[in-house]
Amino acid sequence: AASYKVTFVTPSGTKTITCPADTYVLDAAEDTGLDLPYSCRAGACSSCAGKVTAGSVNQEDGSFLDEEQMEAGWVLTCVAYPTSDVTIETHKEEDLSA
């Protein structure tokens, strides 16, 4: 499978990892020791919500976000596959529910 560079912008700094196209970005982050928020791991809540600021993801497996939210850049990292090099701001659940 292809791999992409995924950059996570977290409250404690920025980290770039390599994520295969068939791996959820949350799983890839955890494999490198990056501690990101999550709860259900099934795309059915907003605990892992982030914002895509560059690039693109496929999150068809998720159910919590609506079309408008996804078009605005919201992403559930637990069900997001990278489809290009992508930058994601993490720890955004409070902004999403605002």
From Swiss-Prot:
Subcellular location: Plastid, Chloroplast
Domain of life of the organism encoding this protein: Eukaryota
Cofactor(s) essential for the protein: [2Fe-2S] cluster
Ranges where the 2Fe-2S ferredoxin-type domain occurs: 4-94
Keyword vocabulary terms for this entry: 2Fe-2S, Chloroplast, Electron transport, Iron, Iron-sulfur, Metal-binding, Plastid, Transport
Any one cellular-component term (Gene Ontology): chloroplast stroma
Membrane spanning residue stretches: none
Functional summary from the UniProt entry: Ferredoxins are iron-sulfur proteins that transfer electrons in a wide variety of metabolic reactions.
Family according to the record: Belongs to the 2Fe2S plant-type ferredoxin family.
Protein's recorded name: Ferredoxin-2
Species the sequence originates in: Phytolacca acinosa (Indian pokeweed)
